[in-house]
Each structure stands twice: as structure tokens, then as C-alpha cells.
Amino acid sequence: MRIKDCILAIDQGTTSTRAIIFAPDSSIIAVAQQEFTQHYPNDGWVEHDPEDIWSSTVVVCRQAISEAIAKGARIAAIGVTNQRETTVVWDRNTGQAIYNAIVWQDRRTAKTCREMQDKGLFDVVNSRTGLLLDPYFSASKVAWILDNVEGAREKADAGDLAFGTIDSFLIWRLTDGQVHATDVTNASRTNLFNIHDMAWDPKLLEVFNVPKSVLPMVKECADDFGHTTEDLFGFSLPILGVAGDQQAASIGQCCFKEGAIKSTYGTGCFVMLNTGTKAFNSKNKLLTTVAYTIKGETHYALEGSIFIAGAAIQWLRDGLGVIKSASETEDLAKSLDDDHGVYMVPAFAGLGAPHWAPDARGAVFGLTRGTTNAHFVRAALESVCYQTSDLLHAMAEDGVSLDKIRVDGGMVGNNWLCQFLAGILDVTVERPKIMETTALGAAYLAGLKAGIYASCEQLASMNEVESSFDAKMPSSQRRKLIAGWENAVQSTLGYTK
């Protein structure tokens, strides 16, 4: 049976690269995944080898394409989604990175960002980008590479270096150096892009000391990003959609209307609220960012960023050996009648919104001789829900009210987590039928540009909810649990002072 107009979605994440091929009805034809090594050269530093990212991308794409073709699929286009903010600088002549990719979790430029803040530069950055002066974003990472790799500044000034987030690096490699481009969502996460003018900002380039010569061209999310070379997959494919992972997940969840909100639970957790065609400025340390630009119309989003979500479970598995697989966590959490006062604050890479404390470090409170592995697991899962509650509280302070939230990401296959989340948030939690919403969003963008889908309205009509979790927690219990969490967070912040 022939399946025409399939889309290959490349989902390049923090810990693995996935290739998923979707049929036009959004059903999955083929999936391939490969993890790659995380590098921690110093305290608070996180790096990836760009060659690991590239090789894993080629491997999973070839595997998925082979499987899909064997099933009679014809692939029409590629959509790309990626870990945002992670920064690569490479030589335009050789295509080789001059330093490892500095990952979004990396905190090495915290001092630089504090010094810039002390110089009164916060408003200069925030008013243009909607972001904060934080090492999370790309600008200070680019500057660090240019300042710390011998000869890099000279090469950049000569026009021999290119900077990009992971999407740009992959597009460069996929097109054999023919296209140096990014999309508006990834550009909006660099601290170099003016989200009101929708262009690279000369003042920000001056402030961060980043030369314009290294920057990629900025395109819409559903746009022409060039073609792959035939030698990669045996035939050339157009790259027609690009978005950062959280924006792609929002698109995959069909959050096209103002007020639609989703929360993605992967390595980190990211809550994104569509605020329509106007940028909404938070007074509670939430980020204003670009949700997407499609067919000339830009929508903005209010975003809360949590650095550690699924990464806490990964730490329990790989760092402490508490579990062998993430699949064990649901049964372990359910094995306890309550949390017994154990709280985990997973500030392994500082705390994100709404605290923005880059120097914070992780802690576990309430340990006794009776504490078991199950308590650690439950505390880790609960910490994700409490952090989400912090974000929604900040949104409420900004005047946003909601009665439901759409969730996605690898963690939400855990029913216990979804039910606890609904209780702590006091809202209905909706889980989609297709869990791969990040990759699906990239596929939707490519499909829109390819003409497979006519409009965002058509995509919204295809969206299906698999499960709903209603809030069942008594308000007194909710208040008690959140008070315990807030005490744990304040104790953690106090430790770092």
C-alpha cells in the first residue's frame, strides 16, 4: 500500500536524536532514536559534541526512511525541531565546529550575565527580546566561544565563522553548507533577536560583542530551508519546516488560538501560553517569546522554563542507581501512601522561572531512616508538578486564568504524574492521543509549506485527546503540600547565598 505525502520529522533533543515519519493523518509510520554522550567538563558546564549530534541525526533518519519505504511510504519533506539555545560555532570553510556545542543548561556565563545586569543592561535586553539576562540563552555562550577559542574573534571578523542553534547547524550539514538559516522561534531564544522588529538587533550585538557576520538568515517556521544532498538518503528532500522544541510542541498540540496553553515534560519542563499577535510583558519573570510565524502572521507566547524535569529521573537512574529504568517510577510512586515529608528541589542547573537563580544547587529535604528509593522517585516526580505550579501561579499574577492544560513529552505517559499534576494545579490535565507532539509540530510546519495541509484550522480539527485527568485533591492538602515545597525552595536558595 502506497502512503503519499509523508513527512520526516527530525527531533534533535538534549539527550537523544529522533526521526519520526508521519502519514498525512498524523499517524506514525516509522521511528528511530539514538542517545548521545553528555559532557560535563567543569562544575555547571554542559556540552555536546556536534559530530555526535550530526552522526546520530544521519543514523536515525536513514533507519526511519528505510523502515517507512519498506511500508510503502513516499516522503515529501522534512521538518526540523531542536533543543533551543544550545550554541554551535563552526568554520564556514570546513563545516567543523571550533568548540563543543554549549548546551542550554550550561551556567558558565553566569558571572558575565550578572556583570551586565550590574551595568544596567537588563532593560536593554528585556525590552527587545522578552528574555532575561541569563546564561540559559545563546548570546553569552557565543561570546564565550569567540573569546576563549584561540583565533576565533579574528576568524569571525574575517567572515569565516558561522553561529547557529542546533537547527542552523543541522540545516548547514543537511544542505552541504548551501543554507545558513534559522527560524523565528529559535532566533527569539538567542538574546540577539528583536521580537518586535523581527530582526537581529544591532544594539544587542554590540552589548554581547557578537559580530553580525556570524549570524544566520531568519525565516518563518513554515518556509523553504533548502534541500538535502542526494548522497545522505539516496534522494533529495526539501526542508520546509523548523521550530524550537517547545514552540513545535505547542504547534503539535494545536495551540493556535490566544489563551491555549501546553506544558511539555522532557529533560526540562516548559509551559507555553499563546498570547495572540501581541507580545505580553510579564511582571513575574516569565519570558515573552515568539510562538510561531506562519504565512506572515506572528503569534507570541508567555513561557515558563524549568531546567530539570525528566533529567531528575535520569539522575536517579544514572547518577544514584536508584532505578534501572524510568518505567519503574509510576509503580514506585504509587507504592507510598504519601510523600512522608520528602521534597526534592532539583536545582542541578540552577533554578529557572520564576526564580532565575543560576547559582542554586539541588537538595533533598525530609530524609529519615525510613526513607527509601520510592521516596526519592516520588519526590522527583512531585518536584516537576510543584515547579509547574510555580509557573502557573506566576501566570495568575500576570492576570492569566485557566481551567485546563495540555501536556506532552516523555514523562506524561506516567498516569500517577498526570493525576498528581492535576491535583496540585487544580485544573484538568489533557494528554493527547499522539504523544510525539514536538516532532508532530515540525511535521505540521513542513506539511503546511508543502501544501499537504491547507491551514492551522485544518490541523486543529485533527487534534485528539487520549486521556483527561481531573483535579481530585482536597484544597487543604494542596495548600499543605505547596507550603512544604515553598519552604524547601527557600531553604535551597538560602544555602546558595
UniProtKB/Swiss-Prot annotation:
Activity control summary: Inhibited by fructose 1,6-bisphosphate (FBP).
Q: In which pathway does it act?
A: Polyol metabolism; glycerol degradation via glycerol kinase pathway; sn-glycerol 3-phosphate from glycerol: step 1/1
Protein name, UniProt field? Glycerol kinase
One Gene Ontology BP term is: glycerol catabolic process
The similarity comment for this entry is: Belongs to the FGGY kinase family.
Q: Which residues bind ATP?
A: T14, T15, S16, T267, G310, Q314, G410
Q: Listed GO cellular component terms?
A: cytosol
* Binding sites annotated in the UniProt record for glycerol: R84, E85, Y136, D245, Q246
Question: What is the gene name?
Answer: glpK
EC number(s) from the headed UniProt entry: 2.7.1.30
- Catalytic activity, as annotated: glycerol + ATP = sn-glycerol 3-phosphate + ADP + H(+)
PANTHER family, sorted? GLYCEROL KINASE (PTHR10196:SF78), SUGAR KINASE (PTHR10196)
Q: Which Pfam families match?
A: FGGY_C (PF02782), FGGY_N (PF00370)
User: Which parts of the sequence bind sn-glycerol 3-phosphate?
Assistant: T14, R84, E85, Y136, D245
* Record's keyword terms, sorted: ATP-binding, Glycerol metabolism, Kinase, Nucleotide-binding, Transferase
What HAMAP family does this protein's entry cite?
Glycerol_kin
InterPro entries attached to this UniProt entry? ATPase_NBD (IPR043129), Carb_kinase_FGGY (IPR000577), Carb_kinase_FGGY_CS (IPR018483), FGGY_C (IPR018485), FGGY_N (IPR018484), Glycerol_kin (IPR005999)
Q: Look up keyword Heme and say if it applies.
A: no
Q: Transmembrane stretches, by residue range?
A: none
Q: Which organism is it from?
A: Pseudoalteromonas atlantica (strain T6c / ATCC BAA-1087)
Q: Name one GO molecular function term.
A: glycerol kinase activity
Q: What does this protein do?
A: Key enzyme in the regulation of glycerol uptake and metabolism. Catalyzes the phosphorylation of glycerol to yield sn-glycerol 3-phosphate.
- Detail which positions bind ADP: T14, R18, T267, G310, G410, N414
Q: Which domain of life is it from?
A: Bacteria
